[in-house]
């Protein structure tokens, strides 16, 4: 019963997080955090009840579904230590430290804090022309100061606190998926969850194309300034980042269904005559998602899509028959390109050749962000403080606010420093290597291999896209990223249900 409740909440979050404007508003990501918290609490209750039940028995028979067993989990690996160290680093940014310690660990932080306390002139290197030297103009507030003689490593502790709870929740969600015992048959439950992700991706694609081609240009009740396809994500680039994970995962799911039918029918003629309509619908849905990503006109999104389709075709080539490439991903991509060409790709193509100004603006943001990293090299300016601290370093004039550095890795480095980004990179490499080893441990022709390869290719595509966009900063994309990564790590533990 509890497992089914957890499953219901998880499915609800997989649907809610992208549709609620990518969960970027405070109310949306707060509901996401509450949903994750409820799942963890329910799992803890279930774990406790099973433990009490087993203790009450005079003899301790083995539990058939092994509810007390911790699966092949990262809880027994160095990954947990690295995750804990990263969270401790963020907590370290939020606790008051002696000013002398801050002066050693972050000299520029000490200089700014000293300016707030003493009222001395602001460092001239941080003032852009026309700016004020008041604390509020720098994105800082003297109310964030702790008691006399102590400073925070984070320039804006409240912003760091908000972002810390986001990361804590998502890390908790990732670890929860490592230990949760799927209800009923694990393979069937996993297929159901992947199908939900696929359907949400198709809905976002169809809705986005309807709004774009009809001329409404809306995301639910919000009017969009851009005519590109964006679904309910507001930004085409965030929308592209989401689909970059969904499309390879869906291709892997499609091929896993195909493999099931091959294993069952033993022969391509028998399989072809018995091809299930659902497989054709899944293939059509993938074509629709690729089509919508093309019409999003996200340049790096399209480049990452082409890369991911090529990569998944190469990785699947050796699974059967020794082919040089897997034909199905190539066929799906070609069909989507032909359909897009029939509709008209003039606007998309022209955008690729008018990118100089856009790249120039990104380059300016990157250069100024590097200046931030140089001033806060070890521990950063504080997780979640980029929007407030960047105006001190901005060397160009814009209307509005720069919310992201247009590069996840660079922004995280400015927020958590070289120490924090180093921990995250080591953690990512360790988990990615473990996921690859898990997939390689599966037997040839195991349908789970297709799902695993599709999930990993989606993760790689998102990382490539993150070189010029913000993806980890978007709650819906971060939630799906954590889900796919956790599921791929769990695949060797999942008992697959043959169709």
Spans of model-derived segments:
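Canonical alpha-helical transmembrane segments
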Residues: 41-56
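Aromatic-rich transmembrane-lumenal/periplasmic boundary elements in polytopic membrane proteins
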Residues: 89, 94-121, 159, 210-218, ...
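Short, basic, low-complexity termini and linkers enriched in Ser/Thr/Gly/Pro
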Residues: 56-80, 122-148, 499
């Amino acid at each position: 019963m509890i497992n089914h409740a957890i499953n219901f909440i998880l499915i609800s979050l997989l649907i809610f997080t992208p549709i609620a404007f990518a969960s970027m508003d405070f109310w949306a990501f707060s509901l996401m955090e509450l949903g994750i918290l409820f799942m963890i609490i329910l799992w803890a209750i279930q774990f406790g009840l099973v433990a009490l039940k087993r203790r009450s028995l005079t003899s301790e028979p083995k539990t058939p579904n092994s509810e007390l067993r911790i699966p092949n989990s990262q809880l027994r690996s160095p990954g947990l230590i690295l995750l804990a160290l990263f969270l401790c680093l963020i907590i370290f940014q939020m606790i008051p430290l002696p000013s002398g310690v801050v002066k050693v660990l972050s000299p520029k932080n000490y200089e700014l804090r000293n300016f707030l306390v003493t009222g001395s002139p602001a460092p001239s290197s941080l003032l852009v022309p026309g700016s004020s030297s008041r604390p509020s103009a720098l994105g800082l507030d003297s109310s964030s100061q702790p008691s006399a003689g102590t400073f925070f490593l984070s320039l804006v502790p409240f912003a760091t606190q908000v972002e810390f709870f986001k990361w804590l929740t998502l890390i908790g969600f990732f670890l929860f998926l490592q230990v949760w015992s799927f209800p009923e048959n694990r393979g069937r439950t996993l297929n159901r969850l992947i199908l939900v992700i696929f359907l949400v991706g198709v809905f976002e694609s169809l809705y986005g194309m309807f709004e774009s081609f009809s001329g409404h240009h809306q995301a639910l009740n919000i009017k969009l300034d851009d005519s590109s396809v964006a679904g309910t994500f507001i930004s085409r680039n965030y929308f592209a980042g989401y689909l970059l994970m969904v499309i390879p995962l869906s291709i892997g799911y499609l091929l896993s269904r195909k493999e099931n039918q091959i294993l069952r029918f033993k022969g391509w003629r028998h399989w072809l005559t018995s091809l299930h309509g659902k497989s054709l619908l899944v293939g059509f849905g993938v074509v629709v998602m690729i089509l919508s990503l093309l019409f999003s006109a996200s340049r790096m999104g399209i480049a990452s899509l082409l890369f991911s389709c090529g990569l998944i075709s190469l990785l699947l080539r050796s699974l059967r028959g020794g082919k040089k490439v897997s034909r199905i991903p190539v066929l799906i991509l070609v069909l989507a390109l032909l359909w897009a060409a029939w509709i008209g790709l003039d606007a998309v193509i022209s955008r690729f050749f008018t990118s100089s100004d856009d790249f120039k603006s990104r380059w300016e943001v990157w250069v100024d962000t590097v200046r931030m990293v140089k001033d806060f090299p070890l521990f950063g300016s504080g997780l979640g403080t980029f929007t407030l601290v960047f105006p001190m370093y901005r060397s160009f004039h814009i209307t509005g606010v720069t919310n992201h550095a247009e590069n996840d890795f660079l922004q995280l480095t400015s927020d958590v420093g070289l120490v924090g980004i180093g921990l995250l990179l080591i953690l990512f490499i360790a988990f990615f290597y473990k996921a690859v080893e898990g997939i390689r441990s599966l037997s040839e022709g195991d349908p789970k291999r297709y799902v695993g390869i599709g999930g990993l290719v989606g993760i790689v595509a998102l990382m490539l896209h993150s070189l010029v966009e913000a993806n980890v900063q978007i709650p819906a994309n971060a939630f799906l990223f954590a889900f796919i990564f956790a599921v791929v790590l769990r695949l060797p533990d999942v008992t697959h249900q043959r169709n």
